[in-house]
Amino acid sequence: MPVPEMKYCMQCGTKLIMRYHEGEKKEIAFCEGCKDFRFPVFNTAVSMVVTNESEDRILLIKQYGRDRYILVAGYINKGEEAEHAVAREVREETGLTVSRVQFNHSHYYARSNTLLLNFTAVVDGMDVHENSEIDSYR
């Protein structure tokens, strides 16, 4: 599924034109109203390999009535640092407190126009507090 291209400036609403950008060495959307280039917009999310202090267990969750277990994940809020989003999402979905965060890798998913940042999140204990965010865990 192709990602839709921006047609109008998100700042002022002016129709965008394509203009050569010297630094990018290609044409980029340009707003004549703002006199600025408009680079593609995408979602940013985090996924976490949630593990205990001894790193001998990994937490997987089921959500939204789906059949398979997945990593804890969620979107980064505007203005939020990725590491903060890691701790927030783990706490919201499991009730666990993150003590250490390490970046692993990133991957762009065209289908949802999302850049996914993967981290290892070490938590204090594995006593998950079930709530409406998850269906089950293991």
Predicted features and spans:
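Unchanged
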Residues: 76-100, 105-138
